[in-house]
Amino acid sequence: MNFRQFTDSCFAILSRYTIENLIIDMRENGGGSEGNEDYLFSWLTDHPYIKYDSVELSRFEFSFINYTDYASDSDKTALYKELRDENELTNSGRIIRKRELYKPASPRSNSFKGHLYILTSGWTYSGGAEFCSLVREHADAIFIGQETGGGYYGNTSGTILELTLPVTKLRIDIPILKFNLAVHKGIRGRGVIPDYEVKPSCESFNQRVDKELKLALSLIDK
């Protein structure tokens, strides 16, 4: 079962049994395939929205490409072709993803209408953080945990070049796309800030106590 089939099946169950409270755990969600965050969010809203203000590329070619996992001629050619096919140089000098490639998922008339709780942490990044920003911006949810690692207004992720330093052989992941979200409710330079901050502790870890989940369940019981 793929992600979208799994998501559909989950919300079908929520609808069938008239579930009123939903907890979504995003604490270790570092992202994944672009568009999955849209698909999940489409089940949480019945209103149209704009996801990205823009997706920006710094350049079409990179001077360090021969030290990355795209060093072979075939990989390099394929990467550069993809970058030029998907992006365009604007009059302002910025390289922006072509507008026709923006395809947010359509909102659903039968979206979840109950109480929503989102668990977050510093490991919530990329598509995971984008999902949290969309929920904060367009839905009514309670966030519990720590501030997301990914920024409220966007992040650098997407296509990643794995650079190997020539002397030390240390490997560094370099994301080359800047995702600028079409949002306005957050704080610049910060992630999604929880309504209830729950700080991790060695004691709760050793005792295997999930403080964030415990708090969410206590709020539901009120």
Place the predicted regions along the sequence by residue:
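C-terminal "post-core" interaction segments
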Residues: 1-222
